[in-house]
Amino acid sequence: MKQTHRPPRSIYPAQNRHMRRRTRVLAGLVAVLCFGGLLARLFTLQILDPSGYANRAAAQQLRDTTLPAARGEIYSADGVTLATSKTCWTIRASPRELADELVQPAAKALSEILDIDYDATLQKLSKRTSNDCLLRRRVDADLADAVRAWCTQNNAQGIQILQDTKRVYPQGNFMGCLLGFTDVDNQGLWGLELQYDAQLTGRNGTILTAKNAWGYDMPTHYSTLQDAVPGNDITLTIRADIQHYLESALSAAVAEHHVAARAVGIVMEVDTGAILAMSTKPDYDPNDPRTIVDETIRQQVNALSGEERSKALQTAQQAQWRNKAISDLYEPGSVFKLITCAAALDTGAVTRNSRFVCAGKINVAGTNFRCANGHIHGSETLAQGLAVSCNPCFIQVGARLGKQNFCDYFAAFGLRAATGIDLPGEIKRSEYYTADRMGPVELASCSFGQSSKVSYLQMITAVCAVVNGGKLMQPHVVQSIRDTERNTVQQVEPTVKAQVIRPETSAVMRELMEGVVTTGTGKNGAVAGYRVGGKTGTSQKLDSENERARIASFVAVAPIENPKIAVLICLDEPHSWTTSGGALSGPVAAEVLQKGLPRLGIQPSYTEAEQAKYFTTVPDVTGWKAPAAAQKLSEYTLTADVLGQGERVVSQYPRAGTTVRRGSAIQLDTTGQLDPAADEG
């Protein structure tokens, strides 16, 4: 019989059955647990926390983007935009989102478009675990568009183009020390930008929107969470036209007279304390504040290296940014005689006709003081002594006034404390003698403007009090602040800080100051058509290592019969044919007055002598040959502007008999095409 083979039976049949049963039970339990977990998760998502699930889903599709708020604008009193905000873009990258094969091409393209270093860009993009890195800030629209185009063309994810704003100063190198500047985050760092940072800074907004990787909005719904609110706008008391006249004249003086330690100019409204112009030259362009403007200093800094160069650059930048008009002290020199004179008149210690003797020098308690340039004026009145700026005269005036009265009026004119102007960086102290420390020698020296140091702003503020009826005004540069709806947030009104001298004293001082310009040392400050009062100053810098260092200054007030504006010009260490304030600074002040007064609606009124000196009547040269007509005009101190190639003059403009300023150009038409009536209209 044939045998068949069967598989052997397990020798442990009961044990195998038990294991199979356990496996089935465990598998069932796992299935139940998984299904239960899934049910619990669905219950949580659908019933207990539906919004949390939606938020997490949206977070993968939506981007929370800051909408930068524009910084407030700054305007001049005559409506010129001085500081504004411009839209720009920031380019950032998320290297972990950028495809490996695009790292090097992206580094090459972005470094070329954005003008940034290739190696540094490649290093940033190669950090594959990085979520964010900055490539370049403050990119203009054309560069941002170029980056977008490259990203679109190469389907590059991880490059972000974010909207931002940057501060722009449309007038360039204009009012730098006054306006100041901001940092890359648009926070004020200097000048008005710092002083009014809280007002100028807006409130950023936020937008939740679907975006692709390089910053494009995707075609889907988005919701704005909060609109950006721009900062408040500020209107200054500064007039751009007056500021331009001041800066132009001051820069020319710095160049012509080789001023070594910068020059200062301030124009103040006499009755209100409003600053119409303020300048320190040389200064800087607030669009590029870290570039040294002074070529000599820039070359000196660039000649250094390493840490030495860094320190020198920082020192030069700080000096360039410094608003010398409010931050530095100086010896006012003979301009200060106005204060001594006003105090002595107000107390009755002297009158305008009090007489003094100048022998060229005077001895006080064993110390000799000489008159400027060794002049011997002999017997002179107070008016004459002020006109010729006689030192011995004012030493005697100071002695009659007395040290206590001198110190009291020094304080009353605001010369011991900061003015409190709405600008940062004003020096908080001045240098002066108190009555208990002042002997006869110190009183003598202080009486004519030496041995005390004040700020330039303090000095012109005090001079305004001398001529405006005796009121010490609060100087200020901001006129008003408005929000984006043009609602007035703040309106600055003139503030009288003190009544320093009697109005009668002020009236006498105006007459004496006019004499300085008409008959004395201030003749270079005269302006045709206006009555001008002033005072010259040439002060020694007592703390300078250079014994010949001087400050040439001049203060002018016009119209002196009804004062509207005061102008202070100071050239610190001029290297010219003279250091006289009347000779160097007087013409600068006169130029500012001549150009500025008409802009303020104050028209000239000429005397007969001025009319003859500055004006002439246009002769009739029609029918004349052109060369002969030009020669005839030159006899009247006029120039010819010949139009066309004709032989004879057919018509002229202005017409014959018109009164014009000498030096004017007269149009001579040889073609017959000139229509004078059109020009007159």
Q: Where are the regions a protein language model picked out?
A:
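Short secondary-structure junction motifs
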Residues: 156, 260-263, 351-353, 418, ...
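Periplasmic/cell-envelope proteins involved in peptidoglycan metabolism and beta-lactam response
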Residues: 1-304, 329, 404-414, 525-527, ...
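Beta-lactam-recognizing serine transpeptidase/beta-lactamase-like catalytic domain environment
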Residues: 4-6, 83, 212-225, 271-335, ...
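Conserved "repeat-terminator" motif of extracellular CCP/Sushi domains
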Residues: 660-680
